[in-house]
Curated annotation (Swiss-Prot):
Purpose of the protein: Required for vesicular transport between the endoplasmic reticulum and the Golgi apparatus. Binds to SNARE complex and then recruits NSF to disassemble it.
Family: Belongs to the SNAP family.
Source species of the chain: Arabidopsis thaliana (Mouse-ear cress)
The protein's name: Alpha-soluble NSF attachment protein 2
Membrane topology according to the record: Peripheral membrane protein
Gene Ontology annotations for the cellular component aspect, listed alphabetically: cytosol; plant-type vacuole; plasma membrane; plasmodesma; vacuole
Gene name per UniProt: ASNAP2
Sequence ranges of the TPR repeats: 112-145, 152-185
Length: 289
């Protein structure tokens, strides 16, 4: 590992010498770029991620000065991979620079891909507001490029984290829109009942029985096959338990559904929120009697 570090530093010094010396304008930067790439690779072999990231940033600068924009964007993306191991904020900043160049040269699919990656950095750091913002940008770019599946994946992430942040209306709109658009697609229509279920659960979190009742009617009009599903019955039974303010019934309905279709952590979190509201309402009424 020490040998790799020594080699990396030697390559970097040679690159600096090239950049500071005389030479034909274009070839000077091209020669330095070759050396910086070798330096970055050696730093990676030495697992010196911060130094590798810095070398890639210098490499990107060389490519920009020789007007190799695509290569510069790729160097920023490589820098991000290195910084990801030590500093996700710096990694996101590098990818943002890559995205700006890809937008400039019309590589919008690459821009979308890297916006999604930035979102995932923030997601792994549990910075959900920032993750939402970048998943939204990625979804918009994927949609413009007509990569519908990727756009849907990003929008579903937006809805998931919006609901976690109690932005229920935003989440509901996304789930309902995706359900609506999926109905006419043979590959996607089987996911419709799942999207309607998650939208319905966001309605439940608002603790508004009228809202969930109206939503259920709308969903059955939208997709007549939803009526006979376990998901539709589950939402209707939960709405009934909420209307009756019956915590025991609510718990039984959840247990029964979970025994047939295991609930993931997001759904469990949403249902716990609804249950807590029911408990709070029960305590409030006890205090009044």
């Amino acid at each position: 590992m020490g040998d790799h570090l020594v080699r990396a530093e030697e390559f970097e010094k040679k690159a600096e010498k090239k950049l500071n010396g005389w030479g034909i304008f274009g070839s000077k930067y091209e020669d330095a770029a070759d050396l910086l790439e070798k330096a970055a690779n050696s730093y990676k072999l030495a697992k010196s991620w911060d130094q590798a990231g810095k070398a890639y940033l210098k490499l990107a600068d060389c490519h920009l000065k020789s007007d190799s924009k695509h290569d510069a964007a790729n160097a920023y993306a490589e820098a991000a991979k290195c910084y990801k191991k030590v500093d996700t904020n710096e990694a996101a900043s590098c990818l943002e620079r890559a995205v700006n160049i890809f937008c400039e040269i019309g590589r919008l699919n690459m821009a979308a891909r890297y916006y999604k990656e930035i979102a995932e950095y923030y997601e792994s750091d549990q910075k959900f507001e920032q993750a939402i913002a970048y998943f939204e940008k990625a979804a918009e770019f994927f949609q413009n490029e007509e990569v519908t599946t990727s756009a849907n994946q990003c929008n579903l992430k937006v809805a998931q984290y919006a609901a976690q942040l109690e932005q229920y209306e935003k989440a509901i709109k996304i789930y309902e829109d995706i359900a609506r658009h999926s109905l006419n697609n043979n590959l996607l229509k089987y996911g419709v009942k799942g999207h309607l279920l998650t939208a319905g659960m966001c309605h439940l979190c608002k603790a508004d029985v009228v809202s969930i009742t109206n939503a259920l009617e709308k969903y059955q009009d939208l997709d007549p096959t939803f009526t006979g599903t376990r998901e539709c019955k589950f939402l209707a039974d939960l709405a009934s338990a909420i209307d009756e303010e019956d915590i025991a019934k609510f718990t039984d309905v959840v247990k029964e559904f979970d025994s047939m279709t295991p609930l993931d952590s997001w759904k469990t979190t949403m249902l716990l929120r609804v249950k807590e509201k029911l408990k709070a309402k029960e305590l409030e009424e006890d205090d009044l009697t």
